[in-house]
Amino acid sequence: MLDIQFIREHTDIVKESQRKRGESVELVDEVLSSDTARREALKAFEEARAQQKEIGKKVASAPADEKAKLIAETKELSQKVSEYKSKADSAAEEYTTAMWKLSNIVEPEAPEGGEDDYVVVKKVGQIRDFAAEGFEPKDHLTLGTGVAGIDMRRGVKVGGSRFYFLRGQVARMQIAMLTMAVDQAEEHGFTLAITPTLVRPEVMRGTGFLNSHADEIYRLREPDDQYLVGTSEVALAGMHENEILDLGNGPLRYCGWSSCYRREAGAAGKDTSGIIRVHQFDKVEMFVYAKQEDSYKEHEHLLAMEQEMLAKVEVPYRIIDTAAGDLGSSAARKFDCEAWVPTQGRYRELTSTSNCTEYQARRLNIRERMEDGGTRPVSTLNGTLATTRWLVAIMENHQQKDGSIEIPQAMRAYMGGKEVIEPTKWEA
């Protein structure tokens, strides 16, 4: 949610942000109109109620010949107060509905355009020349099946399309990767949290995921109304809902480990083979509560954390500055780290980090205590440190001619010193 005072004073900035996102500019006028109607209705209600109370005080001490008249006026005002209250409530509801539709204000530095209009910030690592090595690279599913590590057939049998089993050393590789991510986060002062994967509608709504991404989310309606999270960002944001935080000693930094669920609505025909686009996966997510003036520095820190982790798994990658039209409603700016996938001949997203400024905090009523005793909304930021999809890039970039997979040096200590995952015969 945005600050209504900012919208009133900087209407052009908010409209320009909506335009850059490709969203409704007229919605800003709707918000301002409903704000005016809300304030006028509230003023009328409060004036009528004050008048009602004033007359009520006079009734007790009024002469007998005036009491009947005052009582009649009180009854008439009581009806008006009730009507004004109803109008004020209705106006407030319309205002809130309009306000919650508005997306966060895009940072001026974010590129204009849509999904394909990102700006490449930098590229890191050398892309392998498999032709020079004398063999054609195998895709991650072929490799995973060959080492008895990915079982799509039985995953589909059990859960339906886009489900899978990770087995044996590939399952161990995922655990190693996630554990390595947690260790790195803790070394940088993050607190580990195993988070709920079911959340209340108020929390999901507060994080902004029910705006443009509602069709991606699994909802359990009966007998409870809850949502399955697509990232532990949701639970970590809701953890301090309706709280006043002490950020005097610096930001609060968490890393959440959770299973995640996504419907992948609209993904028909995309990445139907393997584990790039699936309904269930595991992820370590960083989440930060910071002072407003510290959010940009924290965003840089999260991006640096992601790069440190990518260096450990030794895959070529690039960083892109996501265009405004491709941002989620909560994000003011977002950077993606995309790894090179040899068999696809292109970069694929592995991580993203977003600065949500005060947008989520206003919706979830999360504030910080100021030195003067007052409060103000905090900034929230998030960034992925490791997830199941990373296995795709690791396996394909570290494959050997015989179908084995070399384990990145930094991960070997997490896999009992194992250096290579060898092909295995099994009933796939």
From Swiss-Prot:
Enzyme class: ligase
Catalytic activity: tRNA(Ser) + L-serine + ATP = L-seryl-tRNA(Ser) + AMP + diphosphate + H(+); tRNA(Sec) + L-serine + ATP = L-seryl-tRNA(Sec) + AMP + diphosphate + H(+)
Binding site for L-serine: T231, S232, E233, E285, T384
Keyword DNA-binding: no
Signal peptide start and end residues: none
InterPro entries, alphabetized: aa-tRNA-synt_IIb (IPR002314), aa-tRNA-synth_II (IPR006195), aa-tRNA-synth_II/BPL/LPL (IPR045864), Ser-tRNA-ligase_type_1 (IPR002317), Ser-tRNA-synth_1_N (IPR015866), SerRS_1_N_sf (IPR042103), tRNA-bd_arm (IPR010978)
GO biological processes: selenocysteine biosynthetic process; seryl-tRNA aminoacylation
Annotated compartments: Cytoplasm
EC assignment: 6.1.1.11
GO molecular function: ATP binding; serine-tRNA ligase activity
Residues binding ATP, per UniProt: R262, R263, E264, V278, E349, L350, T351, S352
Coiled-coil regions listed in the entry: none
One Pfam family per UniProt: tRNA-synt_2b
UniProt domain comment: Consists of two distinct domains, a catalytic core and a N-terminal extension that is involved in tRNA binding.
Similarity comment: family membership: Belongs to the class-II aminoacyl-tRNA synthetase family. Type-1 seryl-tRNA synthetase subfamily.
NCBIfam families: serS (TIGR00414)
Name this polypeptide is given: Serine--tRNA ligase
UniProt lineage: Bacteria, Bacillati, Actinomycetota, Actinomycetes, Bifidobacteriales
